[in-house]
Amino acid sequence: MEKKIAVTAGTFDLLHPGHFNTLNFAKKHADELVVIIARDETVKKIKGRSPVIPEEQRKIMIEALKPVDRAVLGSLTNKLEPILEIRPDIIVLGPDQTTYQITELKSQLAKHFLYPEVLKVEEYVRCPFHSSFDILKEIVRRWCCKELKV
């Protein structure tokens, strides 16, 4: 029996419980989890700002997490390219991912004769720092205009 492969993708800039929730969800649905890390240049285009952590470091950090079997950098020219190379059985979208709607993603992949199951994590982890942006805002709030003590 072949191993079931799941793919999920994201920036994974400042890790928080929401990231881990999505990774665990994806791993529960497959034998192998491959994570596609958004490129710095892509993040800047989409979010209007560069990630705090460079792409290679984000890749290393994600690969170190227990649910993850492998991490790869996304394509600079075609966001479907890594998915077409990996050919996963399952694609997991995080609760806040808006790059693709499920029907649009399935339609795009079908043009390449790829028909994975596409799942969306419905549970949005609510905690004080449930997004990378919230973490950044708190750092600024605590440390802006203060002398850092090491």
Curated annotation (Swiss-Prot):
GO molecular function annotation: ATP binding; FMN adenylyltransferase activity
UniProt keywords, alphabetically: ATP-binding, FAD, Flavoprotein, FMN, Nucleotide-binding, Nucleotidyltransferase, Transferase
Binding locations of ATP: 11-12, 16-19, 96, 124
Involved pathway(s): Cofactor biosynthesis; FAD biosynthesis; FAD from FMN: step 1/1
Function summary: Catalyzes the transfer of the AMP portion of ATP to flavin mononucleotide (FMN) to produce flavin adenine dinucleotide (FAD) coenzyme.
InterPro entries reported in the protein's UniProt record: Archaeal_FAD_synthase (IPR050385), Cyt_trans-like (IPR004821), FAD_synth_RibL (IPR024902), Rossmann-like_a/b/a_fold (IPR014729)
UniProt family annotation: Belongs to the archaeal FAD synthase family.
Catalytic activity, EC: 2.7.7.2
Cofactor: a divalent metal cation
Species: Methanococcus maripaludis (strain C7 / ATCC BAA-1331)
Pfam families from the UniProt entry: CTP_transf_like
GO biological process: FAD biosynthetic process; FMN metabolic process
Protein name: FAD synthase
Catalytic reactions of this protein: FMN + ATP + H(+) = FAD + diphosphate
Cytoplasm found in the keyword field: no
Quaternary assembly: Homodimer.
